[in-house]
């Protein structure tokens, strides 16, 4: 498949193709403009992949611009996190990082231009009165008593705002458009408000800050953006986007196009709700592996490639829909099945003693790092007469469908010997503490010589060589597909979204590094935790299971 054929197709790319073919544009210039007031989530990843992906495919440019117009909610911590997330996803912005605050002088000048044209006025209604005067979806708004001030008075009052002559909330600059417009966004929207707060880029130079709708379109124009891509909630705002650019002296007039935002099952995307999860300590922070944040997904073990693939699969449309969590999980499962080396770990261990194995001895068995990729090599794993197996891999009695170890029957130990369960020891409560077996010494990685069939295979870890590991079994954060629809979304948090186990891993896991995934054979995909793991304490996070257990549960 050629590069052109491999490109995704969607309505935005069709618009770009038409613009280039008609000569409307000779190049493509997009931007990703996050507000630095929180951590990016999987929904932002869709926008990142769209904007940067288009720039890559059309040999154009994509700017990273921070929409930093509200100093009260913003922080340099979020700036650094967002930069890191964009780079981790595999994208690079054009030129230097931009900030909307870079344009504060020009934005102020354009506001003055609107005042001079009689298209903006200083309003002294309270914020509550402004909301009251705005009207509703079914009732028109009404004009502010301050709407018809003269140009000279508005210029003087706007300067008074700029120099700190008003208290916060006592005055604002509004566009003079139409209070009877069927679109509420066009009912004299606020362009500037007063905030006495230090800005992370401009310090205390300003005490008036432009609103998003005023800033966004002008920043796009100043940067020469050709296609301004937003999610559907900004569809009505396009009217204000165009109104501002139509009424100021600026040579470039970008066009805004809207696409559906990403809604994902079993999670929430609302910044307010995510913040509540963090502040009320329902999760351990913004990078908690159960969170839909990019930092949380990364810590859980998701790869950048899997997130890019997910964004490619869901596509770009104008219809809002909710994507199944299984779709995201299948992307990382396919990625790691193809690329993750294998290792053995026992999550719920029970001791198994091979009574006829030479006491005190051990040997090395060779195991492939990947069953289908010889180029990934092999490793030597120690084997001895005392091993750990998973408790679920043994039953005293079982039906024919159970293909693991059963009392009096045989099973194969992965890449090692055939063993037979002979007896067990139990504690006072009746729990099995030790399984005693015998082994066939002539079955190391080969079938029994007499031709008997041994169907089951289980994994194991040599007890004498095992590494104690903590295993964090992460699952979906909520127990229902649409937690946002619940009366109290916190009431449907999945109580088993994190289960912590103490188990054992093979010695090769000592070399594990954060961000590098393994398939724990027969268990799932895991990675070393970047927060809790130390040289003396190995902590592994489950990224995803080997199969979709939620689909099975719902059948």
Curated annotation (Swiss-Prot):
It catalyses: tRNA(Gln) + L-glutamine + ATP = L-glutaminyl-tRNA(Gln) + AMP + diphosphate. SUPFAM superfamilies: Nucleotidylyl transferase, Ribosomal protein L25-like. A motif ('KMSKS' region) lies at residues 268-272. Its EC number is 6.1.1.18. Residues 317-324 are annotated as: Interaction with tRNA. It is found in: Cytoplasm. GO terms for biological process: glutaminyl-tRNA aminoacylation; glutamyl-tRNA aminoacylation. Keywords: Aminoacyl-tRNA synthetase, ATP-binding, Cytoplasm, Ligase, Nucleotide-binding, Protein biosynthesis. L-glutamine binds at residues 67, 212. Its main location: cytoplasm. GO terms for molecular function: ATP binding; glutamine-tRNA ligase activity. InterPro entries: aa-tRNA-synth_I_CS, Gln-tRNA-synth, Gln/Glu-tRNA_Ligase, Gln_tRNA_ligase_bac, Glu/Gln-tRNA-synth, Glu/Gln-tRNA-synth_Ib_cat-dom, Glu/Gln-tRNA-synth_Ib_codon-bd, Glu_tRNA_lig_a-bdl. A motif ('HIGH' region) lies at residues 34-44. It holds the Pfam family tRNA-synt_1c. ATP binds at residues 35-37, 41-47, 231, 261-262, 269-271. GO terms for cellular component: cytosol. CDD domains: GlnRS_core. Belongs to the class-I aminoacyl-tRNA synthetase family. Monomer. This is Glutamine--tRNA ligase. The lineage of its organism: Bacteria, Pseudomonadati, Pseudomonadota, Gammaproteobacteria, Enterobacterales. The gene is glnS.
């Amino acid at each position: 498949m050629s590069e052109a054929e491999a490109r995704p197709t969607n309505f935005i790319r069709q618009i770009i193709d038409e613009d280039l073919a008609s000569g409307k544009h000779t190049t493509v210039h997009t931007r990703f403009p996050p507000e630095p007031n929180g951590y990016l989530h999987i929904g932002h990843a869709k926008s990142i992949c769209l904007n940067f992906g288009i720039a890559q495919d059309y040999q154009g440019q994509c700017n990273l611009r921070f929409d930093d117009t509200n100093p009260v909610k913003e922080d340099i911590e979020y700036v650094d996190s967002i930069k890191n997330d964009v780079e981790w996803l595999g994208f690079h912005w054009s030129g230097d990082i931009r900030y909307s605050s870079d344009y504060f002088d020009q934005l102020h000048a354009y506001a003055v231009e609107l005042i001079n044209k009689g298209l903006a006025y200083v309003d002294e209604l309270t914020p509550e009165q402004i909301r009251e005067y705005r009207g509703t979806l079914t009732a028109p708004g009404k004009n502010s008593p301050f709407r018809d001030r003269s140009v000279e008075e508005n210029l003087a009052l706007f300067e008074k705002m700029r120099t700190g002559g008003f208290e916060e909330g006592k005055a604002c600059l509004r566009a003079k458009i139409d209070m009877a417009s069927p679109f509420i966004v066009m009912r004299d929207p606020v362009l500037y408000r007063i905030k006495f707060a230090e800005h992370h880029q401009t310090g205390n130079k300003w005490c008036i800050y432009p609103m998003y709708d005023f800033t966004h379109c002008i920043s796009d124009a100043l940067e020469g953006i050709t296609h301004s891509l937003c999610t559907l909630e900004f569809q009505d705002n396009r009217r204000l986007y165009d109104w501002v650019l139509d009424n100021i002296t600026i040579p470039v007039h970008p066009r805004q196009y809207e696409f559906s935002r990403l809604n994902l099952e079993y999670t929430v995307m609302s910044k307010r709700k995510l913040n509540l999860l963090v502040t009320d300590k329902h999760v351990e922070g913004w990078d908690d592996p159960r969170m839909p944040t990019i930092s949380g997904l990364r810590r859980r073990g998701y790869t950048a490639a899997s997130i890019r693939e997910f964004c490619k699969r869901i596509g770009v449309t104008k219809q809002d829909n909710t994507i199944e969590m299984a779709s995201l999980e299948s992307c990382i499962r396919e990625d790691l099945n193809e690329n993750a080396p294998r290792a053995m770990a026992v999550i719920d261990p029970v001791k198994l003693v091979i009574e006829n194995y030479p006491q005190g001895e051990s040997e090395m068995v060779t195991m492939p790092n990947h069953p289908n990729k010889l180029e990934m090599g092999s490793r030597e794993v120690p084997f001895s007469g005392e091993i750990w197996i998973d408790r679920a891999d043994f039953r005293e009695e079982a039906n024919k469908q159970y293909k693991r170890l059963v009392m009096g029957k045989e099973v194969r130990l992965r890449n090692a010997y055939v063993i037979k369960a002979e007896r067990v020891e139990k504690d006072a409560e009746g729990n099995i503490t030790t399984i005693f077996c015998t082994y066939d010494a002539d079955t190391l990685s080969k079938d029994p010589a007499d031709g008997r069939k041994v169907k089951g295979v289980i994994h194991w870890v040599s007890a004498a060589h095992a590494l104690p590991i903590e295993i964090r079994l992460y699952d979906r954060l909520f127990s229902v597909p649409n937690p946002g629809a619940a009366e109290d979304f916190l009431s449907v948090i999945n109580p088993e979204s994190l289960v912590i186990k103490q188990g054992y891993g093979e010695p090769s896991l000592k070399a594990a590094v954060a961000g590098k995934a393994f398939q724990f054979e027969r268990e799932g995909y895991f990675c070393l935790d970047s927060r809790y793991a130390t040289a003396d304490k190995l902590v592994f996070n489950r990224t995803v299971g080997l199969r979709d257990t939620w689909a099975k549960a719902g059948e």
